[in-house]
């Protein structure tokens, strides 16, 4: 089975699918191994569409998804309305290889800086879109930074973030900003 965020699983799945399908829709990390696989698929005339996170410059038909950098800038603008210079922020994203989340993170930090907030006040956690890693990172940030004011979830592990807040007794004390309209995320809206 494919476990998202695991490049080896992604490459294996692409090899398997290439023999059985007429086209592939792919959401994967931008790394040399995936680029090489896309090149081989293109040589075989296998149509590939990337979605949610692009692999810029790769041989694919098109990208379908948000402008992640712009989405991050919008998130930064929203966050800046609730923050003052010096307020501590936690930014959680998959990792720098996942272009969609990196774009969100870069746009977020860029917009905060434009609004007068320092990047030094933003702690960054790469959690590979993994529930347990996100839970551990948010729990650690809450324990180490009692003045943490804001968490920007540029990834989809929002339930892990909320579990960490609940466990630390900080629900309602720390603002959380997230993307995506998933059933899990909607349960936390009030």
For the regions a protein language model found, what residue spans apply to each?
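A conserved helix-loop-strand patch within extracytoplasmic ligand-binding domains
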Residues: 71-89
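Generic secondary-structure signature for well-ordered alpha-helical cores
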Residues: 43, 81-85, 113-117, 143, ...
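Short, intrinsically disordered, charge-balanced linker/junction segments flanking boundaries
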Residues: 1, 18, 187-190
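Hydrophobic alpha-helical
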Residues: 10-13, 23-42, 108, 123-185
């Amino acid at each position: 089975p494919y476990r998202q965020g695991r490049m080896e699983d992604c490459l294996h799945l692409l090899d398997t699918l290439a023999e059985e399908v007429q086209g592939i829709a792919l959401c994967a990390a931008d790394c040399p191994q995936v680029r090489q696989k896309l090149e081989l698929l293109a040589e075989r005339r296998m149509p590939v569409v990337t979605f949610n996170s692009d692999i810029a410059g790769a041989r694919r038909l098109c990208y379908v998804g948000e402008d992640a950098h712009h989405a991050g800038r919008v998130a930064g603008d929203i966050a800046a309305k609730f923050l003052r210079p010096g307020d501590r922020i936690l930014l959680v994203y998959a990792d720098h290889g996942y272009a969609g989340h990196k774009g969100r993170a870069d746009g977020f930090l860029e917009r905060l800086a434009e609004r007068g907030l320092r990047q030094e006040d933003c702690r960054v956690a790469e959690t590979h879109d993994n529930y347990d890693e996100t839970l551990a990172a948010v729990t650690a940030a809450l324990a180490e930074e009692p003045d943490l004011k804001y968490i920007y979830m540029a990834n989809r592990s929002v339930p892990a973030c909320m579990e960490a807040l609940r466990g630390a007794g900080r629900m309602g004390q720390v603002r959380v900003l997230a993307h995506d309209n998933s059933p899990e995320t909607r349960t936390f809206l009030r």
